[in-house]
Amino acid sequence: NEGGDGMKKAVYVPHYAPAEAKAKDLCKGAQSLLERYEIITKYVSDKIAYDYIRAITIPKRGGLPDVERWWKLHMGICLDIASLTVGMLRAVSIPASLIIGWADGHYHAWVEARIGGKKYLYDHDDPQKKVKLYKKERMY
């Protein structure tokens, strides 16, 4: 046990006030949760780059997200990006989880949101939705 489920959730999806404030500001005037989801994921897709240096220096499994670095540099790896995206979605009342597992055989992290009983997957690294098989290992 890594400090209980609450501790793990706080480590993998920490509250980060600047990102949460940005999410609320972006979503002012949004009429639905789906519209908020689309605004946040578009913002992340448009503003955040993949950090190839961090990708080769972080442990392949067991690394932790660095949301402050992500926010300041506008870049991160899948874990950083998914973690902060979940935090931004939750800040605007969208139920969302950070998923860690496998995507087409590669260790990966992505976002799962639930809106109106429907599941939405967001994967910054796969904007064309080419990944055919996601397999959950952990969820936060």
Q: Across the structure, where does each feature detected by a protein language model lie?
A:
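Short, aromatic- and glycine-rich surface loops/edge beta-strands on solvent-exposed regions
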Residues: 1
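Secondary-structure boundary elements
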Residues: 6-76, 84
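Hydrophobic/aromatic-rich core segments of domains that either
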Residues: 81-140
